[in-house]
Each structure stands twice: as C-alpha cells, then as structure tokens.
Amino acid sequence: MRRVILSNPRGFCAGVVRAIQVVESALEKWGAPIYVKHEIVHNRHVVDDLKRRGAIFIEDLKDVPCGEKVIYSAHGIPPEVREEAKARNLFDIDATCVLVTKIHSAVKLYASKGYQIILIGKKKHVEVIGIRGEAPESVTVVEKVEDVANLPFDIHVPLFFVTQTTLSLDDVAEVTQALKARYPHIITLPSSSVCYATQNRQEALRAVLPRVNFVYVIGDVQSSNSNRLREVAEKRNIPARLVNSPDHISDEILHYSGDIAVTAGASTPEHIIQSCISRLKELIPDLQVEEDIFTTEDVVFQPPKELRT
C-alpha cells in the first residue's frame, strides 16, 4: 500500500487570501469591470476565475480608462506606478502583501540614511522590480552567491540587505553567508525578509522528505514560491514535479515506488490540490492519504481601508 503524505501548511497564505478578497470585494462593491495591474497572484486558476467575474488584468496603466478603479497585485509596485495612477485620476486600491510592503518601507528608510541596499532576489520578478523602485540608485540586486564577489562596494560603505519574500531558504542562507563573509558590517531587518508562509511550506516539506520517494508541488509555473518548493526536494535528491492541474499528473508516478509527498505553493487553491489527489487515486487505487501537520497558521491581514465595512 502506498501513501500520499499531504504537507501542511500548504496552499493559500494570508497575503494571497487578502489579495483575492480585495478583487472580490471590489467587484461586489462597485461591479465590473475592475482593473488589476499584473496578475493578482501567480496562479492561472485564480486569475481565470476572477476574469470570469469581471476583473481585467493589465500590465500598463495606459490600458485603464481615466477615472477607473485599479488594484495593485500582491507583489507590489514601484512608486512611479502610483504617480502615474494619480496623474491619470485613477482610483487605486493596494493589494500588496503586508510583508512585501514592510520591505518597501525598509528599503526606502535605509536608502534615505545613506545605505547601499543589497536586494537578494530574481531581477525580473515583479516583486523585486517593485522593491528596487523605492530607491533605484541605491539598490543592487543579487541573485546567487557568485554575484556577491562582483559587488563594487568597499568595507567603508554602509550596507543593508533584504530579500524577495518567496525565495528558497537554502539559497538565502548561502547568499547571506557570502555577504556577511565579505562585508561583516552589513545589517538587515531583525526578522527574515522571507515571509512566514514561504518558510513554513519549505520547512513542512523538508520534514516529510525522508519518508518519500517522489514529490508533487501543486502550483503555477510563474509562482516563485512553488518553484522554490520543487527545488527544496530536488536539492535533496528527491524527484519532484511542479504541476498546476490534475491533467498534468501522468502515469509517470507508476515508475516510482514508495510514498509520495504533495505540497502546494502559496497561491494554489485547495480545490486544485484535492483534484490532484483524486487524480493520484485514479492512478493508484489503493493509495492512502495522510496529513502531516508541521505547524498551524492563523495569520490574517486586514483589507485596504477603501474596502473596510
């Protein structure tokens, strides 16, 4: 008999729940259309559902008619976007994750104090673009350990570092170690920039890996935290697949023996996770499902003031 070990926490985090509720509440309060800058979260199922309900996802504010309402995605935006929205008389609502906003504020503060900011993250990720926009002349993005050796700062330059919220804890630890080795005086926030949900999902998966021979991460290919979950398994030599629907689960799993771990990125709906479990049961009729609870999450973020009742 084979088992699926269902990692917990998995799926939606508080920031994703808040962001989706912002769009839903705006549609309920004002009706369609509601414009959203960038995908509200990186999950095709969520985005397609909101499109059906009247949300219009855009990348350029020029696609929003003057005077209309626009929501900023959970990933955050650079300040210039707010300025453009104001100039075009748009009614903007900010669904940026509270934990991303914290990093924006820290970058702005330390740049104003004369620090050079090291931002650990993926240069092209929308979250990193938004954070860097707070102080573009002061922020240098570092993606990997090798980048640290190429930094131009000498030991007399005041340095502060933060990270993208959805990175691999393994990668962050390696880059942080390299930064501190080269710049012992570098400082950072009192708590990790990697968000609680990213940490919990990675650590929960790590806890079950010794018991499994294969991992499914349910999440969108665009989702940074979903990709990092896949890497957590692969770095420990456990085969892993990132899938976003039951249609992506093939009979490949029949070529592997032993138990299977299932986890999901922070923007993956629970009903998609359960449909993937059902697909596995079709392929393996005697499959048993076991929940592994690493920790419980009770974090709730308040909606923007424009949508509070």
Swiss-Prot record:
Annotated positions binding (2E)-4-hydroxy-3-methylbut-2-enyl diphosphate: 42, 75, 125, 165, 223-225, 267
Record text on cofactor binding: Binds 1 [4Fe-4S] cluster per subunit.
The keyword Oxidoreductase is assigned to this record: yes
Catalytic activity: isopentenyl diphosphate + 2 oxidized [2Fe-2S]-[ferredoxin] + H2O = (2E)-4-hydroxy-3-methylbut-2-enyl diphosphate + 2 reduced [2Fe-2S]-[ferredoxin] + 2 H(+); dimethylallyl diphosphate + 2 oxidized [2Fe-2S]-[ferredoxin] + H2O = (2E)-4-hydroxy-3-methylbut-2-enyl diphosphate + 2 reduced [2Fe-2S]-[ferredoxin] + 2 H(+)
EC number: 1.17.7.4
Residues at which dimethylallyl diphosphate binds: 42, 75, 125, 223-225, 267
Residue positions binding [4Fe-4S] cluster: 13, 97, 195
One GO term of the biological process aspect: isopentenyl diphosphate biosynthetic process, methylerythritol 4-phosphate pathway
Active site positions, chain numbering: 127 (proton donor)
Keywords from the UniProt entry: 4Fe-4S, Iron, Iron-sulfur, Isoprene biosynthesis, Metal-binding, Oxidoreductase
GO molecular function: 4 iron, 4 sulfur cluster binding; 4-hydroxy-3-methylbut-2-enyl diphosphate reductase activity; metal ion binding
InterPro entries: LytB/IspH (IPR003451)
A Pfam family that the UniProt record links to this protein: LYTB
Cofactor(s) the protein needs: [4Fe-4S] cluster
Keyword DNA repair: no
Residues binding isopentenyl diphosphate, per UniProt: 42, 75, 125, 223-225, 267
Pathway assigned to this chain's UniProt record: Isoprenoid biosynthesis; dimethylallyl diphosphate biosynthesis; dimethylallyl diphosphate from (2E)-4-hydroxy-3-methylbutenyl diphosphate: step 1/1; Isoprenoid biosynthesis; isopentenyl diphosphate biosynthesis via DXP pathway; isopentenyl diphosphate from 1-deoxy-D-xylulose 5-phosphate: step 6/6
PANTHER family on file: 4-HYDROXY-3-METHYLBUT-2-ENYL DIPHOSPHATE REDUCTASE (PTHR30426:SF0)
NCBIfam families: ispH_lytB, PRK01045.1-4
Its job: Catalyzes the conversion of 1-hydroxy-2-methyl-2-(E)-butenyl 4-diphosphate (HMBPP) into a mixture of isopentenyl diphosphate (IPP) and dimethylallyl diphosphate (DMAPP). Acts in the terminal step of the DOXP/MEP pathway for isoprenoid precursor biosynthesis.
Family, similarity comment: Belongs to the IspH family.
Annotated protein name in UniProt: 4-hydroxy-3-methylbut-2-enyl diphosphate reductase
Organism annotation: Chlamydia abortus (strain DSM 27085 / S26/3)
